[in-house]
């Protein structure tokens, strides 16, 4: 059973952690601007790296899309920071939104990148329980 502690709560993003399980959950509460997205993702990344977070659930159902420039920024600046660590990211999406398309692009780019696939995994889910099961297996 997860024991989530809120570490960050702003208008656009809620971040909770369970330090005992090296788990982070980030819930987008609204569509962020590009600058908000980058600022918050950088904060989450710095926290995850400093605390050795290995698994993360990103609930993006209230986020409509990710700007193309932010997708590229994430691939170029954020994902490489996790190289050498075993990390699993689960995206909780809704099937009718564009949010699924942009994170699928991230997953495809990650699958084709030079980062070792055995140490960095991304999957998409419509159901939170299924996402958590995958993250903790």
Q: What residues fall within each predicted segment?
A:
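Amphipathic, Lys/Arg-enriched alpha-helical "gate/interface" segment within cytosolic domains
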Residues: 2-137
């Amino acid at each position: 059973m997860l024991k989530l502690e809120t570490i960050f709560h702003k208008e656009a993003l809620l971040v909770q952690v369970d330090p005992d399980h090296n788990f982070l959950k980030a819930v987008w509460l609204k569509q962020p601007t590009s600058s908000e997205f980058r600022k918050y993702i950088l904060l989450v990344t710095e926290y995850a790296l400093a605390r050795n977070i290995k698994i993360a659930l990103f609930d993006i159902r209230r986020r409509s899309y990710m700007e193309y420039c932010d997708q590229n920024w994430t691939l170029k600046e954020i994902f490489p920071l996790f190289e050498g660590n075993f990390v699993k990211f689960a995206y909780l999406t809704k099937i009718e939104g564009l949010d699924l398309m942009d994170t699928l692009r991230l997953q495809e780019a990650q699958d084709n990148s030079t980062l070792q696939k055995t140490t960095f995994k991304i999957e998409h889910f419509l159901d939170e329980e299924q996402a958590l099961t995958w993250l903790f297996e």
